[in-house]
Amino acid sequence: SAGETLRRLWKNHHYTWGVLTQMFYVAAQIMVWTFIIQYADNLGIDKATAQLYNIVAMGLALTFRFLGTYIMKYLNPHTMLTVFGIGAALCTTGAILWVGMGGLICLVAISAFMSIMFPTIYGIALENVHERDTSLGAAFLVMAIVGGALMPPLQGMIIDQKVLFGMPAVNISFILPLICFIIVAAYGRTAARISRRKQINH
């Protein structure tokens, strides 16, 4: 029954953390792509040019999605998620601390690392889910998109402060996506450890 499936999924911590990680990833993606415009505007870049940076970011995500699929032939998905999560976190740190064009370039570069996250988290979360539970399990992973919409308004509120701690508030606001990417990297690392433990036990 659906109730029994829900109980099994709830007890599967690898899966439940996967759903939460997916939620944080989606939140990060929305925040990065939504607020590139405000970040560029703070540097005195007009909105039309700022939109071009957004388009470049999305193009990077698409390009690296294909590259990531190729690289995954040589690296397992857990390692890929960890490495790309760390890469995204480092770029986000650059976007926070570097006030200027360098920060904007870091912000655009985040999209390259986001490219493989959604399908990779999805696949990893379902690794230890029984076949009879996968339909409902997959549905919750897709529904995590809704949860991801909760954080961007908070980032918008931070940006509205204009200046925080002597820095542009738009830079400080990217601490929220930074937290999300750290969670993504940590999930990849934890999943890798679980996978290795299972291989040793077998």
Which ranges hold each PLM region?
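A late C-terminal transmembrane helix in Major Facilitator Superfamily
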Residues: 129-164
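Multi-pass alpha-helical transporter architecture, strongest
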Residues: 175-202
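Extracytoplasmic gate region of multi-pass secondary transporters
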Residues: 8-55
